[in-house]
Amino acid sequence: MSTMAKSPEANNLHQDVIAQFPILNGYTHTVGAFSQPLNVSRLFIIDEIQTAYDELRVQIPWLAHQVVVVDAGPGKSGYITTAPWPSSAPPNDVTYEEKDDAFPSLNTLIKSGGSFLATKDLVGYPGLPEPHGLHPTPVATIRLVFITGGVLVVLSTHHNIVDGIGLMQMWDYLDILMGGGAISRQDARSANADRARVLPLIAPGEPVKDYSHLIRPNPWPLPPPPKTEWRLFKMHPWALAEIRSRARDGTDQRASARPASSDDALTAFCWQRVSAMRLASGRVTGDQVSKFGRAVNGRSAMGLDSSYLFHMMLHTETRLPIEQIARSTLAELSTQLRKDLDAARTEWSVRSYATFLAGVADKTRLLYGGITNPQTDLGGTSTMHWASRRPIRLGLLGDCHLIRKPEGMPLPGCLYFMPSGGTSGVVQLLLCLPKEELDALQEDAEWKHYTESGGRRVDGPRL
């Protein structure tokens, strides 16, 4: 569905980063666990990481900036952008803490699969969607937590400015710099691109895709969300390969048809099993419609790659009756999910998204992803593809044993797909659902076959 573009809030066809949603005014934290090399002091490690971080900010200066709101006024919330770090403020250097006595050893942490990692134990401020309370507000921070046998490196970025793809790319850049290398000129140009020009808005009067569902309704039509909690599941490479094979089974194999990706397949699997669990529990009826909202990386549509660190995510929605989801094959669900994702990942769609956001004077009216009913809907984002790249490492610290998104405030109905770190190929599935739903999901035969939770081993490949 399309409409005609209206004059944007800005006086030209450009505006800053597209992630202008109030809920994104917070931090995404990632933590990597590394061994401390023999005969290498903690002070030396701090100095090495600080040196690399300083060089990264020399080559990509806006990473040293603060996050600010500009152009606010009556009826206008303004928009979020970056500005130089105030000279009167303390420098935004690497911080560190020693927690040998208060935290498990590295070996214990690895054996537990990272189950001890929580935001409140690692950094002095929360992650999304909680208010951060930082003034000034840094674009990025690095914190080191030393434990017996190793160090936890916490890399955090402000989510209005840097998305998950950009955050993962920063791990690569830190490793390159710690190893004595340099960021390529092409990557530096991309990272420093004028973000207000990368995504030109659509001229007034031209057709634009309709994104009006991103405006918060008044009055709010849903009851308060149920109490939810995060739970981590793991999927081994054989399981993901089998699910991907099932998602491609019987689908169109013409050269022009794109096969289901691992993300498509895993999204279809989670949506199907959660819907089947909810249907079996009697909490929903088969004719109720469920929405799966997916975060879409808009870089390729705009001729960009992961070296463009700024936020470039939008959303797509797939809606189906719950009984249809539960009864469909993974191939059928994956095909529909892929079709909707491809429709969202076009230049016109991404530019329409930016044009719509620029035209909303009061950004507090924006609702990230639109209305989500936690009783029926799910939403997911993924950095799973990072597992196909070289393992995450940091110079003298070597390979990352595990990488995690530390546990924070619940986001009902949210799913994260992430690599686990190291070379195992294990994928993390982080789900936020009511406890009774998580417990029921763990008893679902399909879910039990393919996933591991709480130290329980998976069944093994199906013969």
Swiss-Prot record:
Q: Where is coiled-coil annotated? A: none
Q: Which UniProt keywords apply?
A: Acyltransferase, Transferase
Keyword Transferase in the entry? The reply is yes
- Gene3D superfamilies, per this entry? Chloramphenicol acetyltransferase-like domain (3.30.559.10)
Give the misc comment: Trichothecenes are sesquiterpenoid toxins that act by inhibiting protein biosynthesis.
Describe the function of this protein.
O-acetyltransferase; part of the satratoxin SC1 cluster involved in the biosynthesis of satratoxins, trichothecene mycotoxins that are associated with human food poisonings. Satratoxins are suggested to be made by products of multiple gene clusters (SC1, SC2 and SC3) that encode 21 proteins in all, including polyketide synthases, acetyltransferases, and other enzymes expected to modify the trichothecene skeleton. SC1 encodes 10 proteins, SAT1 to SAT10.
Recorded protein name is O-acetyltransferase SAT5
The taxonomic lineage of its organism, from the top, reads: Eukaryota, Fungi, Dikarya, Ascomycota, Pezizomycotina
